[in-house]
């Protein structure tokens, strides 16, 4: 009898230990490839911030052929990172994505132009060729041109839109007068290719009042009806924002952590340290809480997107403070 009691006690302890070790799993799908743009999440994982919240987080890198909305719709992720225009477009098409946190306060998107083209202000775009990213990234640009009254179908009074790949070759090869860049990435690719800041003129979308919210955290609306899922997301957001704060304050270490997670080996230390420094400017002062005014500005910008707007009406229920309120 004593042996049976001892065995039962040992089994109970083993079960308890296993239960204690079984952290809640979360799968995160990034919007793009592994780089400092996502440093906060890699830092949170590396520094044990997720583990402290009893979470086992899998971070899945993105790429040109990976659509975060499609991934979450197919059950491949619990939470995704996306830009608000893409998320709102998906929502209008029937995929009920909800923004639960917004680590990025500012937009890093801009047009970078060669100074020798004579461009000094947006009015000088007329008659020029501009490289523009598509796949949902074109809508802030189209809205901007619409507000300026500049046609996007060519001609002396309009602009010729060059569908730009995810590189800066058009400006280097003089196929375009301006190209789309991010403050933390493609702009520096132009500099590394040999042009100098004095050779360039930049127009930040933030400065033109046509910026849209980028790199928000999204989940499916139906999952927010599950208290257990909500609790898991509260812990996830809290740990992620802790990761972002650490990354902002420890730029070089954060970049190194990103490099350690880059399975492709494509990233360099110089580029990632520089990128992390620029990313820190976009997340500075953020507590993860979405600013309703910035949201409304994004919606207004998208609704002004010319003849083919990304959304046709103001969305309802596309964001919530439920998670961030509890994560504070």
Residue positions per predicted region:
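Cleavable N-terminal signal peptides
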Residues: 9-10, 20
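Secondary-structure end/capping motifs
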Residues: 225-306
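Sec/Tat signal peptide C-region and signal peptidase I cleavage site
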Residues: 15-22
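Periplasmic-binding protein-like
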Residues: 103-113, 196-225, 277-279, 317, ...
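Conserved C-terminal helix/tail region of periplasmic/extracytoplasmic solute-binding proteins
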Residues: 295-328
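Bacterial N-terminal signal peptides that target proteins for export
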Residues: 1-8
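Short, glycine-/small- and polar/acidic-enriched structural segments
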Residues: 24-164, 170-173, 177-184, 203, ...
């Amino acid at each position: 009898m004593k042996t049976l009691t001892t065995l039962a006690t040992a089994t109970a302890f083993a079960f308890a230990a296993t239960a204690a070790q079984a952290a809640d799993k979360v799968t995160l799908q990034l919007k793009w490839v592994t780089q400092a743009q996502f440093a906060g999440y890699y830092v949170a994982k590396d520094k044990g911030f997720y583990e402290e919240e009893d979470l086992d987080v899998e971070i899945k890198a993105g790429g040109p052929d990976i659509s975060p909305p499609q991934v979450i719709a197919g059950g491949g992720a619990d939470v995704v990172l996306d830009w608000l225009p893409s998320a709102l477009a998906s929502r209008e098409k029937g995929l009920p994505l909800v923004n639960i946190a917004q680590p990025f306060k500012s937009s890093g998107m801009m047009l970078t132009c060669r100074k020798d083209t004579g461009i000094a202000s947006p009015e000088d775009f007329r008659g020029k060729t501009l490289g523009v990213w598509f796949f949902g990234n074109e809508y802030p640009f189209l809205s901007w041109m619409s507000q300026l009254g500049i046609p996007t179908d060519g001609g002396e009074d309009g602009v010729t839109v060059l569908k730009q790949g995810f590189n800066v070759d058009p400006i280097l090869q003089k196929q375009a007068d301006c190209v789309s860049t991010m403050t933390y990435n493609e702009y520096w690719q132009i500099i590394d290719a040999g042009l100098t800041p004095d050779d360039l003129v930049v127009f930040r979308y933030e400065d033109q009042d046509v910026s849209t919210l980028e790199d928000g955290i999204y989940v499916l609306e139906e999952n927010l009806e599950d208290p257990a899922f909500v609790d898991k997301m509260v812990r996830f957001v809290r740990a992620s924002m802790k990761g972002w704060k650490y990354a902002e304050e420890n730029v070089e270490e954060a970049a190194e952590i990103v490099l350690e997670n880059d399975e492709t080996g494509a990233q360099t230390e110089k580029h990632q340290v520089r990128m992390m420094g620029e990313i820190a400017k976009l997340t500075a002062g953020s507590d993860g809480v979405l600013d309703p005014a910035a949201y409304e500005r994004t919606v207004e910008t998208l609704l002004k997107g010319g003849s083919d707007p990304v959304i046709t009406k103001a969305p309802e229920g596309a964001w919530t403070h439920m998670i961030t309120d509890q994560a504070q």
